[in-house]
Amino acid sequence: MFASTEIRLTFCQDRPEPREDDSYGVVVQESKPALKVPPMYKVVMFNDDYTPMDFVVEVLEKFFNLNRELATKVMLTVHTEGRAVCGMFTRDVAETKAMQVNQYARECQHPLLCEIEKDG
């Protein structure tokens, strides 16, 4: 009915001679995985002849968290140079932001376009 359990604690310095039931192993230290910095992607906004400048500023404020002044500067770069970088993100975040901007622009009936490009 009753099981008996024997617990034996031994320490290497206390034991003068090895016993036949002892087992010796290798001490393994876990190494931390080497993490690489993920590649970054630019979200690029392209100019068109139909989207109002105020809408572009609104999009930059809403989806890229830019303040009014910086959003206006990016909008003017898009307007004068034909394109501008709205931000740098990891691939998943960049794809999501570009998709959100494109979807929001379509819902508001504007042809505004964002795409992603690998940095470097």
From Swiss-Prot:
Protein name: ATP-dependent Clp protease adapter protein ClpS
Top-level division of the source organism's lineage: Bacteria
Family of this protein: Belongs to the ClpS family.
HAMAP family per UniProt: ClpS (MF_00302)
GO biological process: one example: protein catabolic process
Pfam families hit by this protein: ClpS
Chain segments annotated as coiled-coil in the UniProt record: none
Protein function: Involved in the modulation of the specificity of the ClpAP-mediated ATP-dependent protein degradation.
Subunit relationships: Binds to the N-terminal domain of the chaperone ClpA.
InterPro entries: ClpS, ClpS_core, Ribosomal_bL12_C/ClpS-like
